[in-house]
């Protein structure tokens, strides 16, 4: 299972069966995102959200990257992740790739998600005062999309504050006449 997407259609799942040869996904845009997510889930036959065995991989890099899934002629399978092909140094220079995070779950696909989230919270995004509640932000994008009416925004911000939000994020559409995803973003 791999993932791709675009604006308002993020994280579309693509199930591609193993077959002899190479399946390659690559992003040379210089960034990762929902259109080129640097990750993969390999569920065993019969695995679903809460049952079965699954392996998850996430390449910890936000730049150009590639993923290769290969079934060898003898039936063995291998996975490779790394920087995009043009990411190399000159002679006599070293190059170190990003980390590849890998998990195994015998509790289905959700078990992979839980393991990734636990590792992220315990080892990557640690908070100095873990016993205190974490800051809450409210992003209004999905509540209003392109309809930036000041009265509605104030009402939503007040309700977010009442729920404990410490920051109100006005996401998208604050410049010009932004009424579609094809204009005005940053036209200020």
Identify the residue ranges that each predicted region occupies:
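N-terminal accessory beta-strand-rich subdomains and adjacent acidic, glycine-rich linkers
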Residues: 1-120
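Residue-level detector of functional hotspots within protein domains
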Residues: 26, 122-124, 154, 174
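A general structural-boundary detector
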Residues: 79, 125, 140-143
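Long, charged amphipathic helices and adjacent flexible linkers at domain junctions
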Residues: 120-130
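Aromatic-lined carbohydrate-binding/catalytic grooves of carbohydrate-active enzymes
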Residues: 131-188
């Amino acid at each position: 299972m791999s993932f791709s997407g675009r604006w308002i259609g993020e994280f579309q799942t693509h199930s591609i069966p193993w077959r002899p040869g190479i399946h390659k996904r690559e992003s040379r845009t210089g960034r990762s995102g929902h259109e080129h997510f640097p990750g993969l889930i390999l569920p065993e036959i019969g695995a679903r959200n809460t049952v079965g065995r699954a392996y998850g991989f996430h390449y910890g890099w936000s730049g150009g990257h590639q993923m290769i899934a290969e079934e060898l002629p003898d039936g063995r399978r291998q996975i490779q992740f790394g920087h995009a092909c043009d990411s190399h140094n000159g002679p006599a220079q070293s190059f170190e790739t990003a980390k590849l995070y890998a998990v195994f779950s015998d509790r289905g696909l959700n078990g992979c998600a839980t393991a990734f989230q636990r590792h992220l919270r315990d080892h990557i995004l640690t908070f100095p005062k873990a016993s205190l509640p974490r800051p809450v932000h409210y992003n209004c994008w999905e509540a209003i999309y392109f309809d930036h009416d000041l009265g509605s925004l104030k009402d939503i911000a007040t309700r977010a504050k009442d729920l404990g939000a410490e920051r109100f994020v006005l996401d998208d559409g604050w410049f010009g006449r932004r009424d579609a995803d094809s204009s005005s973003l940053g036209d200020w």
